[in-house]
């Protein structure tokens, strides 16, 4: 994602050979489940990352939450701007802290991603988050929040549509099934041949066959990798790692997976799911590795169940995935399923 100006991955890999988090930060004991959601609850809209360019997008976000049956509360700075960011770091972090501390708010919905969420991680009140476990929803740059909050509190958070994104029929159905019906979800792609002889859209590819069980961690590859050497990555041991990205040339994907390899993360995981890498074609000029070759180099030698093509990432229709949820991955079938509930009491 070209607007993210991070330290180079090769330099990050030399900081700390961590599997997850710095030794000085104690890992939480067990998972922390968010309170269940219901129509009529109050949800908060916050902007932890980039500013939203158009007022209409903010209006549509509020209308979408109301159409889902919620009362809406907005962060003080959710419509602010500071450079490309939605306000200052202190203002954006303050909104997150206030909404987690507010007992009337049952979920925190991120308006958009972009960049800047990682700047907030030292300013978050993890004790307040731990004391008020609630739904956090977003993706892309919100990966920084998913990683840090899960690492520091054990809270299960949700990688899925942003408030200003598309609330199409598929995404609304996912939302209701995950949050209102609290299904033990079966995540398998919707495949439609359309006018093609054989289906092309939403196809999955097995990298290494087999089944594995573990807790899901992951999100956007660039954002997650940029946290290397910090105390804000969860432990990778025995986990099912899911990743996605957008507008990254294959050589960048290769470099970031190399970082995860060098820091010990890839050798620790039990399974691997890659979603969509939207607009990740090689550029002009020198030759390029293909994504197939990159996954064959980095993932296949691990010998763990792995597949690519899941409906996760910068796509119009996307899964709502619980970060910290316990799942079973079936790489041959290109699907995974929840094994346990991911909500506590309402």
Task: Walk through the language-model features, giving the residues of each.
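C-terminal segment of N-terminal export signals and the immediately downstream linker at the start
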Residues: 20-52, 56
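Short, acidic/small-residue loops that bind anionic groups at enzyme active sites
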Residues: 126-148, 156-163
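N-terminal secretory signal peptides and thylakoid transit peptides that target proteins
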Residues: 1-17
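Conserved anion/nucleotide-ligand pocket segment
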Residues: 158, 162-220
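Oxyanion-binding "anion nests"
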Residues: 216-254
């Amino acid at each position: 994602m070209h607007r993210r100006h991070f330290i180079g991955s090769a330099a990050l890999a030399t900081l700390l050979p961590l599997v997850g988090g710095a030794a000085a930060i104690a890992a939480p004991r067990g998972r922390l489940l968010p309170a269940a959601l219901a129509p009529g609850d109050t949800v908060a809209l916050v902007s932890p990352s980039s500013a939203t360019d158009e007022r209409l997008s903010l209006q549509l976000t509020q209308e979408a939450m109301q159409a889902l049956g919620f009362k809406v509360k907005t962060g003080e700075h959710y419509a602010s701007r500071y450079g490309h960011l939605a306000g200052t770091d202190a203002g954006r972090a303050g909104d997150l802290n206030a909404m987690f501390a507010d007992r009337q708010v049952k979920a925190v919905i991120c308006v958009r991603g972009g960049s800047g969420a990682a700047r907030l991680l030292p300013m978050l009140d993890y004790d307040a988050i731990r004391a008020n476990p609630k739904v956090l929803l977003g993706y892309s740059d919100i990966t920084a929040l998913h990683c840090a909050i899960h690492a520091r509190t054990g809270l299960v958070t949700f990688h899925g549509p942003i408030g200003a994104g598309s609330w199409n029929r598929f995404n609304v159905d996912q939302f209701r099934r995950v949050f209102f019906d609290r299904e033990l979800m079966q995540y398998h792609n919707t495949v439609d041949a359309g006018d093609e002889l054989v289906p092309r859209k939403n196809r999955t590819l097995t990298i290494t066959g087999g089944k594995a069980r573990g807790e899901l961690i992951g999100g956007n590859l660039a954002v997650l990798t940029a946290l290397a050497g910090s105390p804000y990555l969860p432990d990778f041991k025995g986990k099912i790692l899911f990743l996605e990205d957008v507008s990254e040339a294959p050589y960048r994907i290769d470099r970031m997976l190399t970082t995860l390899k060098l820091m010990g993360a890839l050798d620790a995981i039990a399974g691997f799911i890659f979603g969509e890498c939207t607009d990740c074609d090689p550029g002009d000029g020198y030759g390029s590795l293909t994504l197939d070759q990159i996954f064959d180099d980095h993932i296949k030698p691990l010998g763990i169940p792995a597949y690519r093509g899941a409906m996760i990432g910068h796509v119009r229709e996307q899964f709502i995935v619980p970060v910290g949820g316990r799942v079973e991955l079936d790489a041959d079938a290109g699907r995974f399923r929840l094994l346990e509930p991911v909500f506590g009491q309402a």
